[in-house]
Structure formats: structure tokens, C-alpha cells
Design a protein with these regions (language model features):
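An aromatic/glycine/proline-enriched structural segment found at the starts
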Residues: 1-39, 197-211
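Active/ligand-binding-proximal structured segments within catalytic/core domains
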Residues: 33, 43-55, 64-69
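Histidine-acidic residue clusters that define the catalytic metal-binding segment
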Residues: 6-10, 136, 152-184, 206, ...
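Short beta-strand/turn micro-motifs at beta-sheet edges
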Residues: 18-23, 76-82, 180
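M16 family metallopeptidases and their MPP-like homologs
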Residues: 32-38, 68-117, 122-171, 188-196
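Bilobed periplasmic-binding protein/Venus flytrap-like ligand-binding cleft at the lobe interface
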Residues: 50-58, 108-115
């Protein structure tokens, strides 16, 4: 397979250079927090997929439990982590009412810092791995889906592997692997907001104090 051709990661230390907002007059605030990560060819891809599963797969996911189950404050939330031949973005996104925007941002900061400081416990990483395996199975239901996945992998210079080998690779991933990657990629994240200007600027002030 081809060697990974990743571009350098942006580790700009100035918070203002990692913040952007779009002013609009709607009743919603949309928040996105994350950074570019690795390509599909990287050995870091699967650990980040496990993290994605932990955060966003199903009603037992960390994002759902924190924002909807415990606080009931979001319209939409999830993780955007597309497959890319180059460095892929890994973004947590959520939309909330303007009244709940500051509270939602504080919750997101708390979750983000927890990912940087505390490894997933055994039960959390086990459940995330099983969800990830299940998602790969769902993506291979038809011959067309299987062929499309294999063609995509080959186009990236990756040799397709069997389901058994893929599951073995997932099983080998540890909480330590994941927390190393969260600190590598997410200690200096980027923040993008769309919403009321005064709310965006207040979030910006809190952002500068934390990142």
C-alpha cells in the first residue's frame, strides 16, 4: 500500500486564529469544534473511528446522553468524520436554541477536556468497538456496497482486508491509543459558530480562556 501523504497538522497556538463565526438572525446557534486528523491510510484511522462510535453512535453515545438525555437542549448533534485520502476533519457539531447556546458550549468544553484528560473505561471502549463493528457490517449489506467500499480503499492505495482481520484490528485498540490521539489532534482545536453575533462573541470570550 501507499505511504500516507498527510499534510502538516495546524497547531496554531493563538485561539483567535482557530475561531470563526457567521452572524445570522435565526433562533438557533450552530457550534462545530474539532480539527483535521489523519488520512484513511493511517493506522490512526481506526482508533479515531472508535472514538467517533463512543461519541455519536446510538442513544447510548456520550453526546446523546450528555446533551439530550441529561439536559435536553439540542436539536441536532453528532460527529463529522468523513473518509479522506488526505487529512480528514473530525468535528463535533450541535445546534441549540439561542437561550441554551452558552450552556451547550460549556457542556461541550467539559466533554472535550474529559477526552483530553481521561481514558475511556473498559465498558465504554468495549461498547464503542462493538458499535463500530456493527456499523461496518451495515455498510456491507449488498454486493454494490461491498464493491464501492473496496474500490474506494484501492483508490487510496489500501488493500482490502477481511471482516475477521478488521475486527481483530479494532479489538487491539486501547484507551491509551485513543487518548494519545485526542491530545495529538484536539488539544488546540478549531471552533466555528453560526448564530446571533452577541452570542458568538460571548462564546469567543470563553473560548479564548480555555484554548
Amino acid at each position: 500500500p501507499l505511504e500516507e501523504q498527510s499534510r502538516p497538522i495546524n497547531h496554531d497556538l493563538i485561539p483567535n486564529n482557530r475561531f470563526d463565526f457567521n452572524n445570522n438572525d435565526s433562533n438557533q446557534t450552530i457550534i462545530m469544534l474539532g480539527n483535521q486528523t489523519c488520512s484513511r491510510r493511517s493506522i490512526e484511522y481506526l482508533p479515531l473511528k472508535v472514538l467517533e462510535a463512543y461519541l455519536s453512535y446510538g442513544m447510548s453515545a456520550a453526546l446523546f446522553k450528555l446533551f439530550r438525555e441529561k439536559n435536553g437542549i439540542t436539536y441536532d448533534l453528532g460527529v463529522y468524520y468523513p473518509v479522506r485520502s488526505g487529512n480528514a476533519p473530525f468535528l463535533v457539531y450541535l445546534s441549540v436554541t439561542n437561550k441554551k447556546a452558552l450552556f451547550a458550549f460549556e457542556l461541550l468544553l467539559t466533554l472535550w477536556k474529559d477526552l483530553l484528560l481521561n481514558p475511556l473505561i473498559d465498558a465504554e471502549i468495549h461498547l464503542a468497538k462493538e458499535k463500530l463493528k456493527g456499523s461496518f457490517l451495515l455498510g456491507n449489506q449488498s454486493l454494490d456496497e461491498i464493491l464501492q467500499r473496496k474500490i474506494q480503499l484501492i483508490s487510496y492505495g489500501i488493500s482490502p482486508i477481511s471482516e475477521v482481520d478488521l475486527n481483530l484490528k479494532i479489538d487491539e485498540i486501547s484507551s491509551l491509543d485513543i487518548i494519545k490521539l485526542t491530545n495529538k489532534y484536539f488539544s488546540k482545536p478549531f471552533l466555528s459558530i453560526s448564530g446571533n453575533e452577541s452570542i458568538c462573541l460571548e462564546i469567543a470570550n470563553r473560548w479564548k480562556k480555555n484554548f
